[in-house]
């Protein structure tokens, strides 16, 4: 590795040395000596009297360089003319003092010591290499036992551990035929004597023969380690140190404090200990002291070196005078305060300031108000330059004086300097890229920065004391970027979902809402006006009110095909306010957009529409006008909240009385024993929840409307002008739920443990709470605050992990020409469309042509509607809607074929700009920010099922909402005695479609449901189409016949029970655990036979109709009774699934991205086949799936399943691979393994979206797909074919793809592999770049691993380039990196031409060649 110091040394011609990769490897003792400028022999630092460094000490000037610039220590040589002279008296070279920051020293250790990282960082590299347990190695290192280093002709094995006694015995027995040592030197000899190549070949041979999975794993780990040593030219013995480098003194300074004391870096203490112990050891060795003393000293030296490298990794940490552990070298680089995160990834910058923000309602969108004082300080260099240029100051010093005195001319120049010079405003926490935007500054008096109200949403800022930072871009390029890319006017759309983020809120919304409302019998109603100007005049003169219904002549403009404005004049029924508002609407929008009551949603839609139709400039000007108008009319409206606005409904008393009497009734039933305690509790809570709903409905109905007599003398209802209602209805502030607490009832509250208290708060805030009610409600309030604090930290950590996993994903090419993609359709759950197809595919690129007639039998001649590779924008989405297309295959990031990066077509639209994404866009970071930014809005809690939530869990029927045709999917069913369908399949679905076969609703139907409609029948809205018993799972007879009981021995395998209430007798099957031992093998079964006693076969199969009954089944038949297909043979009661917690909110998102296996995950079928159950063990059942292949050979898969798992399948049932056998949350790893990449993508996308949708947050699917691509970037090699990979090795998927292409060209055997899903933390640490991984987490482990393997970092990602201080290979830095790569290739190309002429070219491995090729392709 090039020394870090020479890294940025400039050449003689002043150019910075170019480097393309950074390599990390072990340092050999010779290399450490070559870095060093001399040996540190004494532990002294500086002389306490003269304050000069001691010679040969830790701060020695002779080794490290002078303290003052160009001045030796004794003062003989001073000043520049003696540059380079070495003083003969004090031995100091005369040079700059900054060399003390880069010159290193070294310590020659008297005895070798092990490097603690390679010993203790798990898995221990030394242990793995020597194949010895860590305990044994530690005992050797810390002088507790001997290790045999040379066995000779004796019976002792090499690397055998001997205790003191065993060693003495062996000495007596064999004399000096063997050699055993202790301490690091023994380990060093063992490492030195290793023949790596030979060892590797032996292990590979062993790997071929071995069949034990664990041994193979261990051996392949060793092979990887040994190979990495061979490839990287590292010698194993370098893991043991003979020479210790000493850090340059200015990086571990000794600072004099006042009062004669010194503040020092902890490293100096640690070094002192090492030097002291080392010198003592040298002396003891010279004196040939007794072995036991020397040993003790060697052990202490080993401990001192351990503490210096990584304090606290082994044993207790060494503490300083103040009892806190000393900060070692390892602590310097890891953690939030370490080198990586504190100094390399986040630096403080010059030319910045911060201040409180206030509102600037008169600013334009691209402006911000900057206090004069601040501007003067920030723009100083520019002002100095201008003062000199204009000849007002002769020198910079004079200019500085003028500015300090704040002369009047300075202010004029400041105005000049600031003109068109953007500044950047940033509000912490910067959760997404809109947290920093550029504005043009306007100088203002005062000391607070003024911010435009419309950008508050992007910054998440409010004016309750928030502070913001200002940064000044200095260079011309920086100013250009700030203006072109970061100006607030260029960031109208949110990168997360493509909707406008410059949206009015609060006052502005209220103003516009008030302005566009209509009121019956307003002054001036029924007037006819010639134009909007007249409307404004009448309003100003007080002739007409704002809400008066009038007729106005409106002129609308539309662009024709030649780009000319065409006007269209209409008479429209409207109001005065809307006519006035029309005056600010830009040309090209229709009056329909304005001619309605404008709430927050409709204003947002209007701006979005304006952006798509008229472009950026009009939208920005319109947004500003909307804001000014909104503020004006909000002030005019005089809307404010008074206590009389909270109107309590009169029905409230009755509703609460009714609820109380219902509760009393349930209480009585409980006391007579009719209901259990749990049922009583649930019912009480349900009663109160519905009472609360009724009260709030009564309250809202009361608030929302009022009835008035109109001009015709008739009653008419209109929306009320109640202030609180207007604020909620417009979306300005507040919501129905909050109004309910003000004027309805507060409702049910939770206890600290999350359970719901069954007595609700019946009062509201207007009536006031009594003491008990207040006490109950304090808990919730407190929990809310605690939650918020937790949430912020957790959300921040999630964002950090997401950014880290996705940071190197950049758009690198235009089109990868893949035909792959994912199939998208609308998401329908139950009766409502959660997300329409239009919303999902907008801004995506088609992967396949869309044909006009999708249901036409002859596809070949049907016309192409939209070609593949077309970006679906609003226009094409309208076509999709028009032709009723409901399934579209679109390109996706997950299926993109680009090797390192993604192509623009697979990504689709850049949401923040509204057109196809550009090359160099850092889509990974944008995706991470889009998912992480709303993280703070998610909840932290896990939901306990119980009370109100339990009603949802026990639905028992399907009631449809829209009229339509019933379609049944995946249905196996039998027809019962009443002619109804009884479902006997597991994954049945019921859809309601319209006459064009578009799905409107979709429901899952459980096994045993009775369906009232047949496929293709019409159902009307509100009709119940299917029902089932929610509390039991039935066993359904698939044929008619007579029941025959098998193995049902009373008292052994079954018992009879009689119900007290009904007097009916039923048979209950005993669980195997409850049976006597003799009955364990009985398998209670119901068989269906015909009149003659023969088996009946299930139609269409050769399986006889017999049903094995699981434990706890209840049978209400008698042996031999007649049954009809579709009858219920037995019922299995659902165990009341206690309170299973549903993880929701932020923890759920984190679990999904970390790909955690859920507790009690669903069990899926590993292969397709027929289910059977084998012999049971104590706590488990043996599930067998038997499949037949084409040749008729049987293939059996076995799995042991815990008994308490509730199985969804019966014996003899056929399952498909990936089908659910036992319910539970599905594990994404299983989905990937059994159903493939598309299924796991769909699963994660839908589950994550589910959480965000609950909070009303919109995020585009493609962001989640970007993260999933990164989670899937590794694959596991199964068979290595003709490649260099090892079986079981985890390799980048892109690497395998490249190697396979090469192998295919050469006609060799390809690598077979499976995709591997890694959680985001694992995936970040498994990245190819060690710099990126080390700066993320587990720094020690990453660096240890990389240095042993001699890893190279190609600086491909963003993070690595930030750390080495370069432009990032994304955005405007993308071109710079492309140039560098091309230059590098042209240079290496010309070099290789030279070499070709001289000698045959060096053979390149297929890997390297293909990697270079793809890199070149990506680059060009």
From Swiss-Prot:
Binds 1 Mg(2+) ion per subunit. Mg(2+) binds at residues 462, 464, 466. GO terms for molecular function: DNA binding; DNA-directed RNA polymerase activity; magnesium ion binding; zinc ion binding. CDD domains: RNAP_beta'_C (cd02655), RNAP_beta'_N (cd01609). SMART domains: RPOLA_N. It catalyses: RNA(n) + a ribonucleoside 5'-triphosphate = RNA(n+1) + diphosphate. Its cofactor is Mg(2+); Zn(2+). Zn(2+) 1 binds at residues 72, 74, 87, 90. It comes from the Bacteria. Belongs to the RNA polymerase beta' chain family. The RNAP catalytic core consists of 2 alpha, 1 beta, 1 beta' and 1 omega subunit. When a sigma factor is associated with the core the holoenzyme is formed, which can initiate transcription. DNA-dependent RNA polymerase catalyzes the transcription of DNA into RNA using the four ribonucleoside triphosphates as substrates. This is DNA-directed RNA polymerase subunit beta'.
